[in-house]
């Protein structure tokens, strides 16, 4: 089971009882840390003003810049499977991790045994965008001091990853048609 967490969160956020239960059920559990969080490599992280500018550009329909894409993060997930010599996996993702899981399932169908996409989205145009409360929460988390960031990292959250990961999400576009084509059992 390949388990992918969402925006700015590491594998530490998954509840140990879930992981232990899967392992006790005979599953090999692989907890993935996305780029810029946890035990994964770091990209040059953009700042608060850069993120605010990208969010404004997105709101008015302009192209958003991002250091990487969700498709890159899906390729990272498959590279982890390759490194562990795992041919096929049940893919479980939460929030942004669910988006990455969707991409794994339709770009790498031969590697996907099933998909569970938790509290995620296809980013369909008819769905409402994140509200001001969510954007404020992202901005506030991005403004954390070094001490606050260290405390959050201890819990598994990496606020400095927000600009890069948020812009990767904004650039991903509507995946509705691609998700409809997923052949693996999907929940």
Task: Name each model-derived stretch.
Residues 1-58:
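Conserved HGGG/HGGXW glycine-rich cap/lid loop of the alpha/beta-hydrolase fold
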Residues 5, 89, 93-95:
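Conserved alpha/beta-hydrolase "nucleophile elbow" surrounding the catalytic nucleophile
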Residues 99-107, 113-142:
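Flexible "cap/lid" loop of the alpha/beta hydrolase fold
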Residues 56-68, 146-154:
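Short glycine/proline- and acidic residue-enriched helix-loop micro-motifs
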Residues 130-172:
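The alpha/beta-hydrolase serine catalytic core
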Residues 167-187:
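Conserved serine/cysteine hydrolase catalytic core
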Residues 28, 87-90, 111-114:
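Structural signature of beta-strand start/N-cap positions in the alpha/beta core
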Residues 59, 64-67, 71-89:
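Conserved acidic catalytic loop of the alpha/beta-hydrolase fold
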